[in-house]
Regions:
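Single conserved hydrophobic/aromatic residue that forms the stacking wall/gate
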Residues: 1-11, 194
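Short, flexible, glycine/charge-rich loop motifs used to bind or transfer phosphoryl groups or to couple energy/partner
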Residues: 1-3, 33-34, 62, 168
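Hydrophobic, small-residue-rich alpha-helical packing segments that form membrane-like cores
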Residues: 8, 12-139, 144-146, 154-156
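Acidic/histidine-enriched ion/cofactor-binding microenvironments in catalytic or ligand-binding pockets
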Residues: 52-81, 159-195
Length: 195
């Protein structure tokens, strides 16, 4: 339930905030949850071109206002009494063009492919990663990170040995908890927009 509430609250962040303000507002939302203890990692809140930087961290120098024409990426997590979370949301405040819709749909298909995979057939992170990238690869696109990682409990939010990655052949087993985070990040030449 707390994870669902956090996802909804992320989408409800007002566009008049800047990136640092969005980070603070999201943490304020989380602190109101009964079982919340502290963030599981530093929030990634990237607007426009900053959203195309994998593992971007806003600071006073790079902080941008979230504009209605921008795509906004928010990746955050919390340590709760019952477990650790890692939630990523991409929000397009304006009407997306056909290219953005196409890419978003392909990323979503990759996410669904991982979420619905039969683990007895796709029993390694390598095989799942290939399935996640399939729809982007069909149009010669890819992303430069693993599709998912092990999620710890009060340790590291990125925890192994399990992962969904091109380089991970660890056999997946019952009880292993993994994130499912395919994506696509593109900087254009003028650095004004991001897919």
């Amino acid at each position: 339930r707390d994870l669902t509430v956090t996802g909804v609250q992320t989408c409800a962040l007002p566009i008049w905030l800047d990136e640092l303000g969005a980070e603070k507002k999201l943490e304020k939302f989380r602190k109101k949850r009964k079982n919340f203890l502290y963030p599981s990692f530093n929030t990634i809140a990237g607007s426009g071109p900053n959203g195309a930087i994998i593992h971007y961290r806003a600071n006073k120098k790079t902080n941008r206002k979230i504009k209605s024409k921008d795509i906004f990426l928010c990746d955050s997590g919390g340590q709760y009494k019952y477990g650790t979370t890692d939630v990523t949301r991409t929000i397009c405040f304006a009407k997306p063009n056909n290219r953005i819709k196409n890419i978003f749909t392909r990323v979503l298909k990759g996410h669904i492919a991982v979420a619905t995979a039969e683990l007895n057939k796709l029993n390694t992170g390598y095989k799942l990663d290939k399935k996640a990238r399939h729809w982007l690869n069909k149009i010669n696109l890819d992303y430069g990170h693993g599709t998912g990682h092990g999620v710890g409990y009060f340790l590291n939010v990125h925890e192994g040995p399990q992962a969904i990655s091109k380089y991970n052949n660890i056999k997946l087993q019952n009880g292993m908890i993994l994130s499912n985070e395919p994506g696509y990040y593109e900087k254009n030449k003028d650095r004004k927009s991001v897919v």
